[in-house]
Amino acid sequence: PDPLVDLFKKVLPHQPHHGTGKTHMASALCMLACERRLEARFFTASSLVMRLRRARDEGRLDREATLIGRARLLVIDELGFLPLDPDGARLLFQVFADAYERQSVVITTNLEFSRWGAVFGDDQMAAAVIDRIVHHGRLVQFRGESYRVRNALMQEG
């Protein structure tokens, strides 16, 4: 077993503040996987749902799911940033269900688990996703002020 793959096994960077480095860390893990010649995929949650919806509408959802499932590392960024409609929630749930115990998954979010029911529009579906994540997962919390705010050109004064 590759220790790098073990490192990213279901990592969940979480911090209820923007600009603390969650996406940066997820991108770095994706790049590291690629440097190790491991297939990796990086999506925002909303772009992944749009991609899956388009594939389904074009009759190629199984093929798209297979392509996503081939990646050793799957990054889903900004989960909960935009709400999911019921159809999108079901499509995203299927990605989590397919990835469970087969792929390493990194999810970035600003939301605590208690708020995921609102994201998926269904408390039971959210609970099933959370159950799969926490089984083998690691929660990584980011603290501090926003990097973008700290380094903003537009400052008070």
Give the positions of each predicted feature.
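Short, well-ordered alpha-helices that flank and scaffold nucleotide-derived cofactor binding pockets
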Residues: 31, 35, 54
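Walker A (P-loop) ATP-phosphate-binding motif of ABC ATPase nucleotide-binding domains
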Residues: 11
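The conserved Walker
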Residues: 18
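Hydrophobic anchor at the beta1->P-loop junction of P-loop NTPases
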Residues: 14
